[in-house]
């Protein structure tokens, strides 16, 4: 209620009359058939409800141009379809929308025109009959080719060795969740409910593990605590902002997860020199002498993922790894994750929307209402909803 009415420009009431404001809000909610308690704190709203609040705030303020930026990374495909329906509803009332997304599948669902941009420049403007998947996919052909090659190469490196197992994991929302992950396997876990995502995030990061669940985790057959086990790595959401230490050197950032492998790594100049010699060709000769603030986004991603490779974990948990990345950076992140898989490291991706994660997945687990709803093997990906990215690479039998 506060966000929609009181914080908007032009609100002039000196006394806040909540009852009156609630009565003014209800017609807007009824119009789009959404139920949200007006007194609910924003921090307790789901991502979908927050998007609705943002949209209603713009509508109530009569902002005629509304920018929707990468909303597909915040909600699942069912909720995304509802948001699209709201946008179409308000578009008929004269509101205009600027929809920013890295995924052509989303653009085709909602937009009447599209502009393809790269390095701040317009490459192509599309409208009418040009708004087809074949036309738009032309601009991501490099990405598509890499995905196809990855899918084909999977046949050569299948493994049945289980490296991680979680039994009877529970949280505030999750109940009795079981998970097995094989060596070099990529598993995508899609949470269809806000609380599930929060539970899984805390579980995989190892925060408050004893409080979150009474279940047991096993790494290569031995019981383990996720937090502090160097055989398990965790890549946070937007890692270039959340996993780098800008008051430390590039080399110290790179070696920070090697303390279990090399004694006194911080004072071992010879080892650091060897690491530099080994990785200069891969990372670049100049990055080791740069200040952290001088690194490009690509160089930051290289640093994060190379640090993980030096840690040599058996499994890596990633939270929405492609969030906020444009096509160029998505390709690079995809390549880095594919490199982990080729080294036999298992990758578990936690996502709200499958998006690019499906292009790497061997298996998809969808969770709703605290338990597994559906599990798809790669051969079943052709049965996924038609608007899912990369679904076009599979027919109904899961073949390329």
What are these regions, as identified by a protein language model?
Residues 95, 230, 344-345:
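Switch/coupling loops of ABC transporter nucleotide-binding domains
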